[in-house]
């Protein structure tokens, strides 16, 4: 595979397969990204937890495989916490254990149950708990546990899915080993596929610390907005036992095709809530022609809740740490391997605004605002290969403001659009051809220019 599809700014393993992010946690100055990984091949299989660390969420260092599959079980998705109070007894108060909970998937009959492993050396080596599994319903579809410390009850809270039933189950524990069922949520919202990778967490509304809402993320496959994989969210109140949703309508985390299984970091300083997703879609993940690696993560995104037109919405924006990788300002026609395009678009004249980003071999994609349909869009028709897929992905702009903001992060093989304060997001993989690939941008003919625009080069990760 030629290097023009290398992930650059985005994390991928040096070799072999990667899908869901797992065990996201901040500890002792480092962000830990564990991930579903096949250590031996460039296809799904031999599921283990890979491991990478970063001090700034952008520049990652891959470490050896953390939790490996064995002869009896694969290590499916899960999460990690630091047991500061040593509730589990795995560590000490002076050296608390990092504890992972994961789905143990039995090879011979696909039985799934929740299991623990712990580390006393900051996630480098792990011991599987001898009392596993810690939660077993005798089911073949019961997975993806996400743990957190619930301050309202001073206990551990697990969010886990029953995929075929389209249900999220909540469990409580005092010691991480013994779990009691609290309640279930669902079916609700989008239910045309398996539910996976849930995540429940609190956020301030409009940065007001006196007003807290809880967000529940649920990935779904198939049944996503544009076919294949997608992620929906619900907002509501958590009373220590159950989530009471404000409504059960479908709200999409992302309007593109390539952001799935996203979950958030535990223990990020200053109560920030940061999400990373798998930048792919199960409809074509195995056919994406990269080697010796396959699988890329989205840029980390900070999540917030903001009120627009009386409705509370989940917003996602690139983490502020990305600013440290921004280079010189560029003009139309200038070239850079990776770009940030930040613009203010006017809606008052009733005219469209369209940007075109072109690779040096002639392939291109377009994004912008279509005035006729009142949508923010990405069109990758001319930046794709023969893999079957939809190409135009859009989000309807319903605001009445005369202008709105839009930011595009153009990677080596992707675009991530953040618009209207991050409430409308589109993530798409791209094929921008060219062995020595660079990109330039222009404002499409027949469209009005933006009110303002700033384009910067982004320093690649590697």
Regions found by a protein language model. Give the residues of each.
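Beta-rich carbohydrate-recognition and catalytic domains
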Residues: 1-145, 149-195, 204-255, 279-329, ...
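Beta-rich accessory regions
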Residues: 207-209, 235-462
